[in-house]
Amino acid sequence: TGSYTSVDGRNIPMGAYCRRSLLPYFDGDEVINITKQGMPFYETQYKQPYPFRKYDQIFVPEYNMGAMEHPGCVTILDDYVFRSKPTQALVERRAITILHELAHMWFGDLVTMKWWNDLWLNESFAEYMSHVATAETTRWTDAWVTFNSSEKLHAQRQDQLPSTHPIAAVINDLEDTMVNFDGITYGKGASVFQQLVAY
């Protein structure tokens, strides 16, 4: 656990949690440290203090989503609690995921899309901002190299499949929503933001 002092002076309690059986492997201090690096970055970028009273990260088993934001609390697949020595690429991916979910506190939770048609905007922007935050606030200053060789490449591969779709897809029902949580919505959408900023 830890805390962060917001730009508006509030003390924001932070927690990082996992199953008791994983505690010997859990580097919760590093999770909190990455989060503390991202908080002031997002408060400055969004020109808005952290909008909730606390921030918890709960590492959970058998979680299909990978990670999911909720106001003041994020759930993350406990594969990110490393049981053996991880590659630095995996440690970097965890940092990006932590900062992706933190970005959603402002863009996704404080401000929420009206309907799932704008899923792409929610996820693409969080993916883009998490790489900006990683590159500018953490030791992974080459996060965009990783993005271009990983997420962007994955999106390009998915875009060549018969199941490709526009970044801004028409969402009629829950099934449409679920099939759009993919590399096109995340990686291709973030690539478009990257291009717009560079332009």
Q: What would you call each of these model-derived segments?
A:
Residues L102-N117, V132, E136-T137:
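Catalytic Zn2+-binding segment of zinc metalloproteases
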Residues L22-E30, W115-W116, D176-G183:
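Active-site rim elements
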Residues I34-M39, I98, L102, W106, ...:
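Alpha-helical packing segments of well-folded alpha/beta enzyme cores
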Residues E123-S191, Q195:
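Acidic/His/Gly-enriched intrinsically disordered linker/tail segments
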Residues T1-L99, Y128-H131, W140, L161-H165:
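Hydrophobic helix-coil surface modules that form long, contiguous segments used
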